[in-house]
Amino acid sequence: MALKWTSVLLLIHLGCYFSSGSCGKVLVWTGEYSHWMNMKTILKELVQRGHEVTVLASSASILFDPNDAFTLKLEVYPTSLTKTEFENIIMQQVKRWSDIQKDSFWLYFSQEQEILWEFHDIFRNFCKDVVSNKKVMKKLQESRFDIIFADAFFPCGELLAALLNIPFVYSLCFTPGYTIERHSGGLIFPPSYIPVVMSKLSDQMTFMERVKNMIYVLYFDFWFQMCDMKKWDQFYSEVLGRPTTLFETMGKADIWLMRNSWSFQFPHPFLPNIDFVGGLHCKPAKPLPKEMEEFVQSSGENGVVVFSLGSVISNMTAERANVIATALAKIPQKVLWRFDGNKPDALGLNTRLYKWIPQNDLLGLPKTRAFITHGGANGIYEAIYHGIPMVGIPLFWDQPDNIAHMKAKGAAVRLDFHTMSSTDLLNALKTVINDPSYKENVMKLSIIQHDQPVKPLHRAVFWIEFVMCHKGAKHLRVAARDLTWFQYHSLDVIGFLLACVATVIFVVTKFCLFCFWKFARKGKKGKRD
């Protein structure tokens, strides 16, 4: 009997080792809202595969639920902000962000820059609170983690990895102008045919659009390297006790798990330590709550429209709400609208308001005809996954770009939240519902998203386990990160070759002049003789 139980335990241990790269200890550094929701999907899978996952969260963290259904360890470090203060700051900045006038490039990005710097100041203080807390750092060192899984948008995970001397893997959607991806990850984004994020361009650019794209690249490079990065560089140098930069420290990431997909992104060059895992949170629809299911079924052949502007937009003016409600009341479809505000006066009988909706499950229904969205990445991927055409009403950040991508692929119509009329919204809905090309185009994207040899979630987990198993993945990191900008573009080599050519031309010219002078001199002597 003892031998039998020993054999069972051995098989369990070997199963864990071979199926999950040996059960390891994962330390997680994450952000809030959609950032956390994406990482949580991966963490659930890691826990199911036997790994021990510890989330490092500030005392002000908003969304982390210690009573979540899956087993996570939570390491809370104290910070000066309370949850209420932190949430109020986020909501105030989001409102300010969505209200910025987008007509002027310089005005829009200067105000956006201020907002981002304020967020960076908050997260830099969070990072300081962690690394300066001797009790927390001692506990982390004694825990002997195998890997850090961090969101690259919120710096600090790489600093913790350096202090704990362990490898780290990034999760990232994007950074403005792809600045960190290019300078730290070595990812190649030729501005001649790859539009940088936040430019709202497609890969089919005119000459002036390519000029605009280059201006965006230069602007974001200047923004990051000349301004905000200085504070991070100084902070990291002080903590590590040697001169360093944020870009250099982030460049040591073993794997970059980009929350992107070729069904969404425009084609561009790739690197071996970068993988696209966009849409990893998407899954088949689950049954709806009874009341919601009855409302959906009552739509008959006309079907339903799903409407959500995301989790961080909690209110809108009565005027805007009534503009939207008026348009929705005129369509034959039933509408499920995620709305946490006062009931609009113009709300039609075909529209129901919900403070929360199971968005993925609604988009997966055969009766769903269209999705009105703000263009958040998670919602976009759910719409692609289930093949639902979109009406995009982007508000801020990457949302205009996301909708621009879908519009370029013929899967969406775009409207402006601040200027659209009821007629505009009504016509947009009629277009995506009644024009079959929108459904056909988004179904093509859906097929591409589904037709992958390994699903995005499984690839993400594989790479985390791979790094744990091999103690890193340095063999996949390109040497470009070790080069200066002029070495990367071979300007020193070009300069050297030009100097060589110039030297040869100079020597040959001098030699020819010397020969000419010699022969001319001999000719004069011959005439005299």
Swiss-Prot record:
Glycosylation positions in this chain: N315
Catalysis performed (reactions): glucuronate acceptor + UDP-alpha-D-glucuronate = acceptor beta-D-glucuronoside + UDP + H(+)
Tissues expressing this chain: Expressed in the liver, breast and kidney.
Annotated EC: 2.4.1.17
GO terms under biological process: estrogen metabolic process; steroid metabolic process
GO cellular component: endoplasmic reticulum; endoplasmic reticulum membrane; nuclear outer membrane; perinuclear region of cytoplasm
Gene Ontology MF, one: glucuronosyltransferase activity
PANTHER family: EG:EG0003.4 PROTEIN-RELATED, UDP-GLUCURONOSYLTRANSFERASE 2B10-RELATED
Official protein name in the record: UDP-glucuronosyltransferase 2B28
Species of the source: Homo sapiens
Native organism taxonomy: Eukaryota, Metazoa, Chordata, Craniata, Vertebrata
